[in-house]
């Protein structure tokens, strides 16, 4: 298993995003990405990415197939239905497909959260360090 820190950069090649800061959260079941203006049309979803710190991320409109809809308990403890997309995430040396929920994370420090379902049997999290994978690049 690859060792990662509690904060890492990830690549989302299908969205054209690279070196995006992500919180690694073993307490969260699923992964999520910050977006808004989520519009569902049939089995497709269109959403707008926002992060003024990351120029390639800010104001980017994306349309993808819906992977699933599921109820998720948010950080404030409320349960809400979310739309999930399925795209590859590169974390460290490896790339794996992941289901990622679309969520407004504007009050969160990091635009992406990587949950334990993605990390299970692949990564070991060292919570005393961050950006471990960057050092190996």
PLM feature segments, named:
Residues 1-137:
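Pepsin/retropepsin-fold aspartyl endopeptidases
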